[in-house]
Swiss-Prot record:
SMART domains xrefs: Ribosomal_S4, S4
Biological source species: Synechococcus sp. (strain WH7803)
Domain S4 RNA-binding: 90-152
PANTHER family, alphabetized: 30S 40S RIBOSOMAL PROTEIN, SMALL RIBOSOMAL SUBUNIT PROTEIN US4M
HAMAP family per UniProt: Ribosomal_uS4_B
Subunit structure: Part of the 30S ribosomal subunit. Contacts protein S5. The interaction surface between S4 and S5 is involved in control of translational fidelity.
Keywords: Ribonucleoprotein, Ribosomal protein, RNA-binding, rRNA-binding
Protein family per UniProt: Belongs to the universal ribosomal protein uS4 family.
BP GO terms, sorted: ribosomal small subunit biogenesis; translation
Name of the protein this chain belongs to: Small ribosomal subunit protein uS4
Stated role: One of the primary rRNA binding proteins, it binds directly to 16S rRNA where it nucleates assembly of the body of the 30S subunit.
Record Gene3D superfamilies: Ribosomal Protein S4 Delta 41, Chain A, domain 1, RNA-binding S4 domain
Length: 202
């Protein structure tokens, strides 16, 4: 399953607020479609699937990528669900979004893919790069790169930069100063349901 490129508000109407996907709010609170307002009891599978979809759409990863992250999270010590969230939060595109360099995760990914971002002084165009403590993320010393980032920083997607990131706004750079904690994740999600969803599939 490839990355979603369709109408984003249809997704937020079905799944709820996804800060990484879009900053717009849906006008209608019920799911799209002919039977969107119908009340029906959801199965346990449907609830788990919905939580999984929240994660996939918010961080803009494909199904195949998410499966890889689940496997990696299982191999690490500690809670699989928390490990999974940390892996997704540490992606370079998401870190750029949390810093305000991009208005959304897809917007931040475009900055990375087009070579506007450096990590430790080197241009890095791999959105899935795992940021770690000590890494310095900066906007490239080019007029077009700076203009894009400065424009986005005026209206960031999220109000607050998480404590594990230290932003120097005038210099358009930031440092990863610690590990991302569970409570700093902006998405409302039950990650245990995501782990349960994949328990029989992976």
């Amino acid at each position: 399953m490839s990355r979603y490129r369709g109408p984003r508000l249809r997704i937020t109407r079905r799944l709820g607020d996804l800060p990484g996907l879009t900053r717009k709010a849906a006008k209608r609170s019920y799911p799209p479609g002919q039977h969107g307002q119908a009340r029906r009891k959801r199965s346990e599978y449907a609830i788990r699937l919905e939580e999984k979809q929240k994660l996939r759409f918010n961080y803009g990863v494909s199904e195949r990528q998410l499966v890889r992250y689940v496997k990696k999270a299982r191999a690490q010590e500690g809670s699989t669900g928390t490990n999974l969230l940390k892996l997704l939060e540490n992606r370079l595109d998401n870190v750029c979004f949390r810093l305000g360099f991009g208005p959304t995760v897809p917007g931040a990914r475009q900055l990375v893919n087009h070579g506007h971002v450096t990590v430790n002084g080197r241009v890095t165009d791999i959105a899935s790069y795992q940021c770690k403590p000590g890494d310095v993320i900066a906007i490239r010393e080019r007029k077009c790169s700076k203009q894009l980032a400065e424009g986005n920083l005026e209206f960031p997607g999220l109000a607050n930069v998480p404590p594990h990131l230290e932003l120097d706004k005038p210099k358009l750079n930031a440092k990863v100063v610690g590990r991302c904690e569970r409570e700093w994740v902006a998405l409302e999600i039950n990650e245990l349901l995501v782990v349960e969803y994949y328990s029989r599939k992976v």
